[in-house]
Curated annotation (Swiss-Prot):
PANTHER family: CYTOCHROME B. CDD domains: cytochrome_b_C, Cytochrome_b_N. The cytochrome bc1 complex contains 3 respiratory subunits (MT-CYB, CYC1 and UQCRFS1), 2 core proteins (UQCRC1 and UQCRC2) and probably 6 low-molecular weight proteins. GO terms for biological process: mitochondrial electron transport, ubiquinol to cytochrome c. It comes from Naja kaouthia (Monocled cobra). The gene is MT-CYB. Heme b b562 binds at residues 75, 174. It comes from the Eukaryota. This is Cytochrome b.
Length: 372
């Protein structure tokens, strides 16, 4: 009877035998989320959402609270690892055509937007110099909305400038949004398992499936262990690697930093925003840089799902990756030549990927039909 139970348990989740390491990032994201919620809870115990005390409370956590520096640095570094994993997860989806499972892809895009909002609110909380000015610049983009802009901005701020009510509501939102992320993640996973995982070939996996446990579960554990090892290495040897030096100074509304920029994981969107000299145009481009992902399920034209056998599409995909990295790099630089030109060129390349992919799909279809 025990053998029957073991066989039943191991066959509860049959998975395609050929899914690669790129399929491990979902479980790594779940590990990141759990780590963020645990460390965030301990930080919230000691944090004070008040503009006079917020910066001091973070200093108090790192200096006086036992193991507080570990909690604070784990929370910061694992946020960066979270975004590395999610960007890799999205890139895998684009490469292997996983967006054709529309419900999963659209729920994933909703997750990405929620995650970005959560990270933005979290970045404001320490009330450092860069936190304050990044919040001022980004929330001020709402004023670009015709007619309603100023009213919406005042409503979000809770006054006529970023002040105590703003910090309080940002803390409340930063605390509640991870629970919304958990709910959306559950929806994402349920929708995925109603149809099952895809595989690198883009073919139906039903003909060759193996139990998820132990084969893929051990592979997941290996990748999670590797990620945690990297996390602990950064924590031990270079905990401030990803922090902005400006954020070690308390927010001062009277002094503007020489170069205002958000965390590295938002730089691609910030670079696109900055490359357009018009405020409304830049805001729309910023929104579109993320929301354009929702168009991919509806613009797929190729006969084959995966890019594995489409060399022209592969060139386009790797151009997108290079473009993403270049925009991130230029957005971290001051607004001056040659960075303005590079930023504008790479922004055009970024959006071109989503326009050229369906056109290239048609071309590849014709090439295949000609060869046949």
């Amino acid at each position: 009877m025990s053998n029957q139970h073991a066989x039943m348990x191991s066959n509860l989740l049959p998975v395609g035998s050929n899914i690669s390491t790129w399929w491990n990032f979902g479980s790594m994201l779940l590990a990141c989320l759990m780590l963020q919620i645990m460390t965030g809870f301990f930080l919230a115990i000691h944090y004070t959402a008040n503009i006079s005390l917020a910066f001091s409370s973070v200093i108090h956590i790192t200096r006086d609270v036992p193991y507080g520096w570990i909690m604070q640095n784990l929370h910061t570094i694992s946020a960066s690892l979270f975004f590395i994993c999610i960007y890799t997860h999205i890139a895998r989806g684009l490469y292997y055509g996983l967006y054709l499972n529309k419900e999963v892809w659209l729920s994933g895009t909703a997750l990405l937007v929620t995650l970005m909002a959560t990270a933005f609110f979290g970045y404001v909380l320490p009330w450092g110099q860069m936190s304050f000015w990044a919040a001022t610049v980004i929330t001020n983009l709402l004023t670009a909305i015709p007619y309603l802009g100023v009213t919406l901005t005042t409503w979000l701020w809770g006054g006529f400038s970023i002040n105590d009510p703003t910090l309080t509501r940002f803390f409340a939102l930063h605390f509640i949004l991870p629970f919304i992320i958990i709910s959306l993640s559950s929806v994402h996973i349920i929708l995925l398992h109603s149809e099952g995982s895809n595989n690198p070939l883009g073919t139906n996996s039903d003909i060759d499936k193996i139990p998820f446990h132990p084969y893929h579960s051990y592979k997941d554990m290996l990748m999670i262990t590797s990620m945690i090892t990297l996390l602990l290495l950064i924590l031990s040897f270079s905990p401030d690697l990803l922090n902005d030096p400006e954020n070690f100074s308390k927010a001062n509304p009277l002094v503007t930093p020489q170069h205002i920029k958000p965390e590295w994981y938002f730089l691609f969107a910030y670079g696109i925003l900055r490359s357009i000299p018009n405020k409304l145009g830049g805001t729309l481009a910023l929104l579109l840089s993320v929301m354009i992902l929702t168009t991919t399920p509806f613009t797929h034209t190729s006969f084959t799902r995966s890019m594995m056998f489409r060399p022209l599409s592969q060139i386009l995909f790797w151009t997108l990756i290079a473009t993403f990295i270049t925009i991130t790099w230029t957005a971290s630089k001051p607004v001056e030549p040659p960075f303005i030109t590079i930023s504008q060129t790479t922004s055009i390349f970024y959006f071109s990927f989503f326009i050229l992919t369906p056109l290239l799909g048609w071309t590849e279809n014709k090439m295949m039909m000609t060869n046949n």
